């Protein structure tokens, strides 16, 4: 019975570590998405400052990124 309790505690500890790892990955993913959205929005705001050829190239790249 003591061995089972010890294995149970080890299993709980392992599951807690996995849960923390998953939570970290989710939070990192959300932060990366927000940073990407902000960079994209900033790039859109800068389009008006570009010449015609650069504007065409930039809009094509941004369409591909979207």
From Swiss-Prot:
Gene3D superfamilies: 14-3-3 domain
Residue runs in coiled coils: none
SUPFAM superfamilies: 14-3-3 protein (SSF48445)
Membrane-crossing segments per the record: none
Source superkingdom: Eukaryota
Pfam families recorded: 14-3-3
Family note: Belongs to the 14-3-3 family.
Name of the protein this chain belongs to: 14-3-3-like protein 2
